[in-house]
Regions:
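Extracytoplasmic
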Residues: 145, 150-178
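Active-site-adjacent loops and short helices of periplasmic peptidoglycan-processing enzymes
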Residues: 1-144, 148, 153-154
Length: 178
């Protein structure tokens, strides 16, 4: 609602598993971190690592060795709900925050930042355990908190452009010179 005023709610504060709604925070945080760290997501690239090919659930079918811009990975995150893209983005951003090359550590750092942002945004009943939303004991939220997060996201032009895209095609670079 444009005024931000709550009109009607039903169990808005009931804590639930949120599955792929987690990717809304992942997308939000990647865009915000890139802005804060002065990174150009249209030019900055990430080489998909081997572990990403073993992602479960829905994926964007990213392939080890392919090179994507961060913008392309955001589309891969949001359009097909790509768990592989979520892991790649978390690895990239966690590496920026942590200056580490270990993907497991980078992803942990990113998830920790997701939870820090929850506090900053006033999402009192939200907690994340991973960047993609696959079942995890720590990943929970409420309809109210998700609505607050979505309202913040709708103020970001790139987020709006991504979620309103019906079809996205891109050219990828490979790192194996083929």
């Amino acid at each position: 609602y444009p005024s931000g005023q709550l009109i009607l709610s039903y169990r808005a504060k009931q804590s639930l598993e949120i599955a792929s709604l987690t990717k809304i925070m992942t997308c939000y945080l990647i865009i915000k971190l890139a802005e804060e760290l002065k990174r150009n997501i249209f030019d900055e690239t990430f080489d998909v690592k081997e572990y990403v090919e073993y992602s479960t659930g829905t994926t964007a079918e990213l392939i080890h060795g392919d090179c994507y811009t961060i913008e392309q990975l955001l589309y891969a995150l949001m359009l097909p709900s790509g768990n592989d893209a979520a892991m790649s983005l978390a690895d990239w951003a966690g590496g920026l925050l942590n200056a580490n090359s270990d993907h497991r550590e980078n992803i942990k750092v990113f998830v920790k930042e997701m939870n820090t942002r929850c506090k900053q945004l006033g999402l009192k009943d939200t907690r994340f355990g991973n960047p993609h939303g696959l079942p995890h004991k720590d990943t929970r939220s409420t309809a109210y908190d998700i609505s607050v997060l979505c309202t913040k996201c709708l103020d970001i032009p790139l987020f709006c452009r991504i979620i309103s895209t019906k079809e996205y095609r891109t050219t990828i670079k490979t790192t194996d010179n083929l």
